[in-house]
From Swiss-Prot:
This is Vacuolar protein sorting/targeting protein 10. Its main location: Golgi. GO terms for biological process: Golgi to endosome transport; Golgi to vacuole transport; protein targeting to vacuole. One of its GO terms (cellular component) is membrane. Residues 21-1400 are lumenal. Residues 1534-1566 are annotated as: Disordered. It comes from Kluyveromyces lactis (strain ATCC 8585 / CBS 2359 / DSM 70799 / NBRC 1267 / NRRL Y-1140 / WM37).
Amino acid sequence: MFWWNILIWLGLWNFLPVLAQDFKPKVSFHSDVDTHGRLSILGFDDSRVVLKLLRGVELYRSEDNGVTWDSVGLPLSSDNKPQEWNHLVLDRIYKADVAYLSGENGVLATGDKGKSWKQLTFLDADNHKIDFSDYSNVGDENRKPIINVEIESHPTNKNARIINIYELGKLDGKFTLRQISFYSKDGNNFKLASSGSKSNDDSNPLNMFCSFVQKSSKSKLYKLKDKVICQESTVLSPFGDVSSKLYITDVNFKSLSPFAEQLQDLSPASTFISDNHLFILTLSDRFNENSAANLWRLEDDSTDKFEQISLGTQIRKSLMDVNEIDGRAIITIYHRERNKDGDNNDDEDKSPFEDIFSGSIEALISDSYGKNFRHLSFDEQKASSLTLSTSIFVKKTMFATWTNTMRDFGFFDFRSKVSFDLGNTWSKLKVSDPEGKWNYNCDINSDSNDCGFQMFIVYGGGVEGDSDIFSPGIIAAIGDVYEENPSGDFLKMGTFISRDDGSTWEKVLDFPSRVVMGDYGNIILAVPFDPESDKDPQSEFYFSLDQGKTFQEYQLDKSFYPTELLPSALDGSGNSFMLVGTIMSEDYQNLESVSYVVDFSDAFKGASCKTSDMEDWYYSNGQCVDGTILKFRRRKQDAQCLIKTTYKDLTFEEELCGCSELDYECADDFSIDSAGKCVPDFSKASLMEKCESKKSIQLEPKKISKTTKCKRPQNIIKEEISCAAVPAPSNVKVTENKFSSIFKSYQYFDTFVRESILFRTDKSEAYVSHDGGQNIKQIQTGGEDILEINFNPFFNSSAYLFGKNKNLFATHDYGLSFKVTELPAGRQLGFPLSFHAKDIQTFIYYGGESCESFFDPNCHAVAYITRDGGASFEKLLEGASNCEFLESAVESPRVENGIVCMVKDKSTGARSYVSSTDYFKTQTVLYSDILGFMSTGGYIVVAVSHGERQLRAYLTIDGVEYSEAVLPADLDSYEQKAFTVLGSQEGAIFMHMTTNLDKNEEFGALLKSNTEGTSFVILERAVNRNSFGFVDFEKIQGLEGIILINTVANAKEIVESKDKTSQKKLKTKITFNDGADWTYIKPPSVDSEGKKYNCNPKNLEKCSLNLHGFTERKDVRDTYSSGSAIGYMFALGNVGEYLTPVSEASTFMTNDGGISWSEVKKGSYQWEYGDHGSVLVLVKDNEPTDTVSYSINGGKTWKDYQFASEKINVYDLVTVPRDSAMRFLVIGSSVNVRGEETRTYTLDFVDMFSRQCQYSKDDLKDFEYISLSHPNTKECLFGHKAKYLRKKSDDCYVGMAPLEDKFRIFANCSCTRNDYECDYNFMRVSDGTCKLIDGLKPADPKDICSKDNSLIEYFEPTGYRKIALSTCNGGLMLANSDSPHPCPGKEKEFKEKYKVNHTSFLAIWIFAVLIFTGMLSFIYYRGIKRNGGFARFGEIRLGDDDLIEENNTDRAVNTVLRNGVFLFSNVYTGLQYFGHQVGNFFKRGLSRFGNTTGPSYQSLLHDQFLDDADDLLVGHDEDADDLASFIENEGNFEIGNDEEVDLSSDTPTHAPYSDNPEEANPHEST
């Protein structure tokens, strides 16, 4: 009997699995045709009711999980037509019975599971009903006003609802998205939420977005549980104010009151609300939505007090999201950037998929208090996309899936890891294959590699999209298994199952599927995405009744793409499912929508599980988590039953644990270090406050977690903290970083958008920071050394890192992410890339062929071009070492695809200059022997060898026509051995031609070209340069025509010195009119200590301010001035006759463009400008220091700030190139026992100001226009009166305020002498005039005709030409003579212009004679004859009133008559006087011959009478003096100055100081 029973039980045991394998679920089918893909399905919680919306018009309802359907009537429109609805959504809180239909017509709502629907009513602020079907505000009926609707319900007040609508409208003729918010107290009638405020611009409407503070019944924000927060902002417009206003009200919306008032001046941008935390993001710049932002958290038990949260990284508006897990805030920051600066062009050909995956993502998680954040460092590499999957039931588990690249559509390269301790530690997802069924390309059993399950989509387990579905420890996912080389094809992925909450995974299906779970994971339904995954065209689904251990196939008779797979019970407790799919035609047109209801209620013959079928499952293998051990009851895997507790939430049991280290977090004043230890965080303000006036303090380094339930708390020992290391409370924030290597190079990306900077060290490592150096991270290159970094000057978000192994690391998002491409074979030569100005994907790379050794004669450079961003390279030209795209070099190239290159011949070593328009399939040699070429300011300048050891310069402005740079003829005596192109501005090139090349005695002539860049004149003759060709020449940024140079005062002595022992004596000169006039710099009256200088400042020749220039700079990027801090300059120098060594220098400053200077510090300092000059920072140079000096009031006062605990040697003080940020980076080093250590200190001055400056075009508010012109110009410079916009308030910062009118021309002026400079072959002499150089001739005036074919005339040279910058009109015309000549070949046009019509001329002349004769006749008869004729003519006296005047005509005639008599009298007297003087002349001559000793009585009396009388009529003409001077100096083409120059005046003048060694008195001036 015993054995018989055993056989019976064995038979039954073998039979039961057969029953499960033979089971087929009940399947119901339904089809809908002509849906055009518009099908929406919705199920209610804890209910069998399902809704279906077809074609946006027809609504159906099912009460049996979708087996049968009934039509539901919906409200009609006002004209009794069906309304169209776009979205069918379930209420987020009341999922059991409330749903909504929304569309362009408004919103419908149901409260009875879809049986009946009511149209919601919307009212404006004046209680007028809003009709959303009215499209008049859009202007195009094809574009609907409502784009999206978001509906919120209050978790404890069902009738309180908020609806936020995204509405399409028009703004300035463009379609604009606008947010409007409505509230309801009864759930049916909604009124517009409005603060009553208006935008500054009435044409720019306001956005409003409102939200309940209490998001769920679990919310811990108790004091705000019945409150609503609204955010109001203007609809964005270019350069507008992007900040918001925050309001708070209750659920009844009685009134809106300001919220978070302490943040209102800090530009609130976004609000993030979760169950435990309320965060507000504020912008550092209200005018820049991409500016760095700060995060603020509502303090515990407060309603309106916020504390700032430090994240350790930069965050940006609209690129940040906040979620919550187990009371901890998770912040994801998506750094996705495209070139949007004004000087960039978006890449229109860029793949949209590449753009989506082109950024990078950071993720951070807070402690349980939401205060201290740490990075979720799940991988060394930067992620370009990231999915964090967490469970709402077991919250400690996190799955991270990220991608680094997406190469093409359909190619996926992703990685995954799992954490069971909230991101503290991460591990790979282990793969199990106990039966060895699957082949993988890596070793899944090894713990030493990264071979694991790479998760793409996750299902079940209460994770992400299935967050309400709970299956204890049972999770399904789509993904692949690999270590390095993914298959890249989505359809080659598999479906995997885990039964231990993600610790291990097993493949169950060899294709990707949609997966849904029921009966708490005991039923798993999977539908392949591809119907042909099983090699037949029909669709099928697979199901498992043993938690994924085995699957059975169920074949369907249709072929479709599965769009939705829904459970009947939203909590995963049910046993039926709905599968929805779409049948497509071959051309991807939607033909039919199908739905299947799959019912498993009869599985296992309807058996329900008993206690013996259940098992205990412990989360995290029974480890204590948050003070508890979690235990769930779940069905045994092979049990032949279903739990069948439909609509019942599964619960778990908790067992409390004793407190351990895992239940504690770092205290508020501490942060966790790399070793996991809590260390004092000296950057926190709270620690600074506690340490104030104390030597040391004792604090507990840890605090117990807010979410733990552990018992028996540990005794935390306090730690003593020395306050010496804590900086004193200050508005300057300091962040220190230490490196064991030395920075060899560093450079910011030139942009307003970010403060991103790249570093390269002496260990060939590369680092990046996106917050001005506060957080510096190493760029992962796979261990490859970085040899060089190139920045793209045309696309300021792009940079390229050259790897030693010939990899090129490219970034197009300011260093947030890098893509790796391989460089062409051959040796890297270190030549910079050549970029295309209009195509970010196109650049030229230079590699070396046959260069095993650089001394190999066969070693030569080769230029390669890429047009796909480096993905592939083509050989462009052999021997080319420098190329330029014409579209990058000149403004208006005359050819397309033009490229010019310098090519070196391998055999002769000669360099040639070649061009091509077909990527060098054909080429043209333009010059066969050159030294090199460069581009500057729209010109290309080519240095061509000329004769023996001489050069000639050729220029082009279109890339086709080249002209020789014609230098002044008096320089012909000098060999043109070296010249330096100093740049171009406003249509003129500045160039330095070296006239003395002796070592340490170099100097030369400063030249300036005409607009064409072909004809040069000398500005100064002895301008200093060094042996490297650098010149002491600097144009002041942001101001017109101001240049500083250093001249060699003893140039003649140096040239004539035979032993070459003379030292250069340098003096600084400044010009305010682009080089036309130069003067020494007037020194300040006293030094920084209030003492007078030891020289007389009235004598500028002996006492002027001399500055160290470009030739002495350690970093050529350190300029005197800044383009954003208008008028400000710093310089090192001294007051005296000559420039002294830099060791004796002081630091000087000007804020008016160089007119007046002051000494700010003794000794030499480095300087930087911040926030357009709002912040000025100095740091000691050439000696150890721990202190910076700063000024926030334009240099009026200075304060010292100690930024380091010990003195360091400062290498550099840097900030963003545009000097617009308020963060400064100090780079230095200190020496310790381990050697030299690099240290960086980021000084943040953003808290130094209480607010951001206010500005608008109509009201300057915190700004003013100032004139920075030299006083002697009477505000007219370059022919106009210009003013500059500058901040006038010291308590605010500028940021990116839209200062588009920062330079404004108020009026044009008449031309004066200051608007002209000397023409070719003319030179300025000591009296300020332009004189033809002896022995030379003016330029042939006809040459201008050959350069401009549109001209028909030319003028004889006058010795003057108009300064290119001048916009003057009228006034003194010096450039053209009065006699024009026709251009050769343009005689006909010339005559046409100046021809005279003889017939017309004769007619006009006759008409004028007749008029004149008639007038004389009328005056004679009416005036002279009527009053007695000519007889009385001699009796008339001015002022007599005895003439006949009977009417107005008589009075007019007599007035003319009186004036005529007066004129005749004066002319007659003048003739008499002239005759008298002539007579006297002859009489004096005769008297000399006659030897008379005294005058005759006739002469004496007659002369005295006439002199006394005629003095009343004849004045002294001062112009006669000028005329005499012009005649005496007729060869000089002299024009007198407009103003006299007073050399004794304290005011520096524009009068020139000549340094011509040949002049006897070089400093004479008129």
